[in-house]
Amino acid sequence: MKKQLQKLLTCLLSGILLLSLLVTTPANQLAVKAAPAVNSPYKKACWISFLDIEELLQDKTEKTFRATVSAMYDNVLHYGMNTVIVHVRAMGDAMYPSDYFPWSEYLTSDRSNPGYDPLQIMIELAHAKNLQFEAWLNPYRLSRDNKSTVSFKTTPYYAQFLPYTIEYTAPGGQTCLALDPARTETKDLIVKGIREIVSRYDVDGIHFDDYFYVSGMADQLDIVSRKNNVNALVSQVYSTIKSIKPGCTFGISPAGNPDNARSQGADIDTWLSTPGYIDYIMPQIYWTDVYMTANGAVPMFSNRCSAWTALNKQQLPMYAGLALYRVGTNSKTDLGWAASDTNLAYQYVTAKQLGYDGYALFRYQWLEKEIAAAELNHLKNY
């Protein structure tokens, strides 16, 4: 009987929390709306992933490429954003003519030269529309599944990279490739590629996400060694960028769970307490505040935001990575996505109250999906 009462009480409390979050709109929390995005001191960004590029821009003529990118940027602006974070290297490849990496198969399906410079066009169009442009790179990843592994092995770069490449089995059984973070050759190659971008293109920033030591890649390696290897790269990337273009920012978007980020080699404690590593942090806080646990609902988004704020000893700019792709989804654990269409606005307001300086939405394609329209319209008012 006692256990039944405890269970009933837990359910009642969870229901009350859910109801309170549903009726508490961002307007209740923030009386003054933000200035237009292009003039806002807050970063309001959209990630444009290699998946977006493949779906919308692959194998296009220059004219069609320009028109499509321009329309994409107009959509970003329509929803009140001022920054695009665009994949320029997703898997040991390049969305531009590179001296060090092959053309991306997500840009041209046969990895051929498209006959124009896609990166230059994307930057020019962004700046013409007053959008900041950050070049997004995955430093180590060369492939993500069997198909992309076979594809990369057909390039002449595979033989070149082979001495410092790890071939591993990812969860699910897929064979993947990655540059070995422990090797000096890996670090040198990545830094050369970043030097190439920053010296040739007018990018406003360089951006890494959370793909460092992914599951299966080097599971036998301890966390301290992982962090040391990644730190050696991150510090050199930072100093290289600043030596070429001091105003170009370098930021990282780690996994939203700090412990998971650390396990992947992201030394977030050092980055957020010691100068010389990053200019900003953008944790991927992909939960709502109605997240179910064995003990009932918890405000997971707010809890994660607070945890990252506590780590930020340098008081660096912080931006919240938000899960646009989850809006409207039915989840057995994260109930907020299906229960409300003000999650993103609520999350942005909450993050600002905790000291964050903006957000980024993952990813572009959901700007065009009807299921996300209500969420986006609420968000753009803030």
Predicted regions located by residue number:
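Sec-dependent signal peptide cleavage junction
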Residues: 21-37
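Active-site-adjacent "subsite" loops/lids of carbohydrate-active enzymes
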Residues: 38-67, 124, 134-135, 140-196, ...
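Aromatic- and glycine-enriched glycan-recognition loops and surfaces
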Residues: 60-79, 106-129, 229-233
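Catalytic domains of carbohydrate-active enzymes, especially glycoside hydrolases
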Residues: 67-94, 200-205, 276-281, 351-359
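Aromatic-lined carbohydrate-binding/catalytic grooves of carbohydrate-active enzymes
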Residues: 81-114
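Aromatic- and acidic-residue-enriched segments that line the glycan-binding/catalytic groove
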Residues: 96-109, 141-173, 211-224, 335-336
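Aromatic-lined carbohydrate-recognition surfaces of secreted/lumenal glycan-active proteins
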Residues: 132-144, 207-211, 226-265, 316-325
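Substrate-binding cleft of secreted/luminal carbohydrate-active enzymes
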Residues: 275-302, 307-382
